[in-house]
């Protein structure tokens, strides 16, 4: 998923902050963000992360909701930013809560979450 999709899905689940990743909407006005939402929601639906209803309701699928919520409601997180031989490695963030550990890998335009 994209960073914007991740933040929109997390927001739909009630998150006000997503620690460990840069704000993908930084520099955008409220109007620009609002205009971009339908396209972001459509992309999330195409990836199977969410469902769009006929009444334009938008809901996050159960598996995606479980993993994203574990990140946003974590007890703590660890961010790893590494440079090897002058080449920046993808950012990795480990989120830890009572029963879950989730690894986020941020490769700029693509974010993967792994249990």
Label each region the model flagged.
Residues 51-101, 107-115:
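Accessory beta->alpha helical hairpin/"wing" motif in late/C-terminal subdomains of nucleic-acid enzymes
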């Amino acid at each position: 998923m994209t960073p914007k999709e991740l933040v929109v899905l997390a927001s739909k689940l009630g998150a006000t902050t997503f620690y460990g990743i840069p704000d993908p909407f930084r520099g955008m006005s409220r109007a620009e963000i609002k205009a971009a939402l339908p396209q972001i929601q459509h992309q999330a639906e195409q990836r199977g992360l969410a469902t769009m209803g006929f009444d334009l309701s938008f809901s996050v699928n159960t598996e995606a909701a479980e993993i994203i919520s574990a990140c946003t409601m974590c007890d703590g997180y660890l961010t790893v930013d590494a440079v090897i031989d002058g080449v920046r490695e993808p950012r990795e963030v480990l989120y830890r809560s009572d029963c879950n550990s989730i690894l986020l890998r941020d490769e700029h335009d693509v974010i993967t979450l792994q249990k």
